[in-house]
């Protein structure tokens, strides 16, 4: 199997919007609203200009299966990720996180809704530990030195 991360380009807006508007993804996102096409295109244009926010497409054997975003927060880098709905149940979230972090150092952070069992398992199997819970959110951290 071949694995690849590549930075997103504007032309990825369509697949990213499709994944983001999937009902399961929406339910597990901070903002569960249906995202409109023009709003999403504007978001992608802005994201591509930001220096402290990077997003990648993850491919397995040349098939795009997910995306991971890394936001530099100063004290830590926050990760957020989506697996293509066509790929659910294959443990690709865990694989994507592990491979993404393989050569990285520092503190990493993610926020996951308590009902998002697949993302919880992916984060915990990737070495993240719970640092706090508030309301419907679980906060995770991973220190890689």
Q: Model-found features: residue ranges?
A:
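Acyl-donor (CoA/ACP) binding surface of acyl/acetyltransferases
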Residues: 1-15, 19, 59-145
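Residue-level marker of structural boundaries
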Residues: 22-25, 34, 49, 88
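Conserved GNAT-fold acetyl-CoA-binding loop/helix
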Residues: 24-44
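Sparse recognition of residues in long alpha-helices and their boundaries
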Residues: 32-33, 56, 139
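A short helix-loop-beta-strand connector motif used in the catalytic cores of GNAT acetyltransferases and
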Residues: 45-57
């Amino acid at each position: 199997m071949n694995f690849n991360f590549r930075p997103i380009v504007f032309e990825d807006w369509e697949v990213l919007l499709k994944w983001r508007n999937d009902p399961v993804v929406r339910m597990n996102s901070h903002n569960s609203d249906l995202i409109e096409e023009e709003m999403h295109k504007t978001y992608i244009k802005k994201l591509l200009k930001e220096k402290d926010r990077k997003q990648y497409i993850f491919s397995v054997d040349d098939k795009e299966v997910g995306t991971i975003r890394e936001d530099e927060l100063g004290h830590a880098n926050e990760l957020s990720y989506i697996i293509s709905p066509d790929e659910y149940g294959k443990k690709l979230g865990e694989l994507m996180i592990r491979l993404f972090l393989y050569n990285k150092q520092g503190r990493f952070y993610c926020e996951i809704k308590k009902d998002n069992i697949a993302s919880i398992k992916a984060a915990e199997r990737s070495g993240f530990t719970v640092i706090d819970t508030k309301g419907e959110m679980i906060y995770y951290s991973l220190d890689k030195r």
